[in-house]
Design a protein with these regions (language model features):
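C-terminal coupling/interaction segments
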Residues: 275-334
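Conserved NTP-handling cores and scaffolds of large molecular machines
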Residues: 107, 231, 235, 256, ...
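Non-catalytic surface loops within mature trypsin-like serine protease
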Residues: 31, 129, 241-243, 273-275, ...
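ABC transporter nucleotide-binding domains
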Residues: 4-9, 14-214, 219-220
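ABC transporter nucleotide-binding domain
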Residues: 178-277, 302
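Conserved protein kinase catalytic domain
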Residues: 78, 122, 149, 228, ...
Length: 334
């Protein structure tokens, strides 16, 4: 079965003078999926999104969005996409219903069609009861949901969500996550979502595929589970006697090939089980058996997968603030 890609870029480059924001970025996002774009500040995420949404031109390479070349046919790209940023673009002096009808008119949906689409989205995002109140009286989470609804007025084939829950409290963030999940899982419009976020939990919860960007290139790509498997699980044991810490570390070193970390205060030894070196269902029992054979009594033992935060830190490198500042300044100077 042939895969159709909603977003496809090959060798995408962007230079700002001597600053190389993108250095050959390759993306392939299948239709009807949620792809999370992660990376440290200055990695090139925002630059990539600006190119894919036709807000800036690439220096090199090519990109297709919904089958249209972003350089050769930017108007067609704009007709096929929706964009929602980290700041709600709604008008506080208008009601929620008036906001969506305005967006509908701007998108060419007038009269009955525009009113029907606005009403449909208000109900879909749980905003019907507040629809006729001015948006200025709404909570931050409600405004962000309205902003997300506005991005869907035209039934876009690709929706770009740029840090959509920044600054929201946990409850409001969960509401946005639910709306995005339902958009892809239950929706009939076939929308593809490209999500950039600073919340790694957000990418873990929403994205079927994650692309980690570092220094303008793709550092890694895969499902959250596969990315976590790349750095392995972490085994940690708590010994009963302080004098057995070194022995416990030696056993873990021999079993896993990792570098045990000792904590004399907590009487623990932790080590990363690299790249699935041992089967996940067998690792912990085997560790306990080997420790027992070595005369190391333990009071606790655990094996846990790494968090996406740990994956992120392992796969990315520290950036220089000078490069970050130069890129950001030139991107937003216009």
């Amino acid at each position: 079965m042939t895969t159709t890609y909603a977003v496809l870029s090959e060798g995408l480059e962007k230079n700002y003078g001597e600053v190389h924001a993108l250095r050959g970025l390759d993306l392939a996002v299948p239709e009807g999926t949620v792809c999370g774009l992660l990376g440290p500040n200055g990695a090139g995420k925002t630059t990539a999104v600006r190119i894919l949404t036709t807000l800036t031109a690439p220096t090199g390479g090519r990109a297709l969005v919904a089958g249209h070349d972003v350089t050769r046919d930017p108007a067609a790209v704009r007709r096929a996409i929706g964009v929602t940023g980290q700041y709600a673009s709604v008008d506080g002096d208008l009601t929620g219903r008036e906001n969506l009808r305005l967006f509908a008119r701007l998108a060419g949906l007038r009269g009955r069609a525009g009113r029907a689409r606005a009403d449909e989205l208000l109900e879909r995002f749980g905003l019907g009861e507040a629809a006729d109140r001015t948006a200025a009286t709404w909570s931050g989470g409600m405004k962000r949901r309205l902003d997300l609804a506005a991005g869907l007025v035209t039934r876009p084939r690709v929706l770009f969500l740029d840090e959509p829950t920044t600054g929201l409290d946990p409850a409001a963030r969960e509401q946005i996550w639910t709306a995005v999940r339902e958009l892809v899982e239950k929706g009939s419009e076939g929308t593809t979502v490209l999500l950039t976020t600073q919340y790694l939990e957000e990418a873990d919860r929403l994205a079927g595929e994650i692309v980690v960007v570092d220094r303008g290139r793709v550092a890694a790509t895969g499902t959250p589970a596969r990315l976590k498997a790349r750095i392995g699980a972490r085994a940690e044991v708590t010994v009963a006697e302080p004098g057995t810490l070194a022995r416990a570390a030696a056993v873990l070193d021999q079993l896993t090939g990792g570098r045990p970390v000792l904590d004399e205060q907590r009487l623990t030894v932790g080590v990363t089980v690299l790249d699935g070196a041992l089967d996940g269902t067998l690792t912990l029992p085997r560790i306990i058996r080997e420790l027992d054979a070595a005369g190391v009594p333990v009071t606790d033992a655990a094996l846990r997968p790494p968090t996406l935060d740990e994956v992120f830190l392992r796969l990315t490198q520290p950036h220089g603030t000078a490069v970050e500042a130069a890129t950001a300044d030139q991107e937003y100077a216009a």
